[in-house]
């Protein structure tokens, strides 16, 4: 579960490395946000590359929206099948729910597929679990 003030890794190549959650937008539960939920984050650490377009560049202190891809708590599926990740990871999105980066690193849980707005994130992911 992701709560306010949680530090998360960024799983795309948008330039941000670590972000901190400041608000839960579309949370599926009252306890915290899970896989597939949208949150508002602030960039804590970023890497500025010279070949990134200005529209895709993310700077330290910038407020963005993000969708949760993986959590340490994990996801329970039918038949007592349980999936966990080693880190809490997000992908940064714009106001049209399209990813800012052009590549996603690591696997993405299938529960993101429930929300049809994030179909582009699933299509650019390396592995879908």
From Swiss-Prot:
GO biological process: translation
A Gene Ontology molecular function term of the record: structural constituent of ribosome
Subcellular location: Mitochondrion
First-listed, main subcellular location of the protein, grouped into a coarse class: mitochondrion
InterPro entries named in the record: Ribosomal_uL14, Ribosomal_uL14_sf
Signal peptide bounds: none
GO cellular-component term (any): mitochondrial large ribosomal subunit
Domain of life assignment: Eukaryota
Official protein name in the record: Large ribosomal subunit protein uL14m
HAMAP family: Ribosomal_uL14 (MF_01367)
Gene: RPL14
Entry keyword Chloroplast: no
Keyword vocabulary terms for this entry: Mitochondrion, Ribonucleoprotein, Ribosomal protein
Family to which the UniProt record says this protein belongs: Belongs to the universal ribosomal protein uL14 family.
